[in-house]
A protein has these predicted regions:
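Terminal, low-structured helical/coil segments at or just beyond the last alpha-helical repeat
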Residues: 45, 151-189
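Canonical tetratricopeptide repeat
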Residues: 52, 59, 93, 134, ...
Length: 189
């Protein structure tokens, strides 16, 4: 009888105290991805389990994107889309990667295309300010005299969510552009 009670308590502890797949997707996404086939085996996979695997891929993709490892980020986001082809986080990540690659090319045509990709990223996650920051950078690189579009992009970036370092960068870029705009306007008066 004692053994039964101990076993029951151990089983209860394991089921109640072990992290859920959804929690693991955030804290240890590598483990979830490594066990993807096991988690998704069977005919009746729960939506929670499926979304946990999608979240794990997105977490890995976001980390790789932040580290500027675009190939790895792209791979992870594409894996996410295989499981959930309308996933906004994965689509946002892919749009940002494409935009950044085009921005890096630097030619006029690529800059126009990067603006389109950054705009697409804002569609998938309108709360983020980073795509607007890159739009401002692309407008500056394309035509640094187009002050209205540059200022608008940086101001939109500040309305969105930015990490503290990027927020400072955007504020500095905006101040510099406004100063150049003022100098330009006073010169031509």
């Amino acid at each position: 009888m004692k053994l039964f009670i101990i076993l029951a308590l151990v089983c209860y502890w394991l089921t109640c105290c072990a992290p859920s797949v959804a929690e693991l997707a955030k804290t240890n996404p590598e483990a979830v991805v490594a066990r993807k086939d096991e988690l998704l085996a069977g005919k009746s996979v729960s939506k929670e389990t499926l979304m946990a695997v999608v979240d794990a891929y997105n977490t890995l993709g976001s980390s790789a994107l932040k580290a500027k490892n675009y190939n790895e980020a792209e791979k992870q986001f594409k894996e996410s889309l295989v499981l959930d082809n309308k996933n906004k986080q994965a689509n946002y990540g892919l749009a940002m990667i494409e935009g950044l690659r085009l921005f890096k090319k630097g030619n006029r045509s690529a800059l126009w295309d990067s603006l389109e990709k950054f705009g697409k990223a804002t569609y998938f996650d309108p709360t983020k300010g980073e795509p607007y920051y890159w739009m401002g950078r692309a407008y500056e690189k394309k035509d640094d005299g187009d002050f209205e579009l540059i200022v608008e992009a940086y101001e939109n970036a500040l309305k969105g969510n930015l990490n503290p370092e990027l927020k400072t960068e955007v504020e500095n870029c905006l101040a510099t552009v406004k100063l150049r705009q003022k100098t330009h306007e006073s010169f031509w008066k």
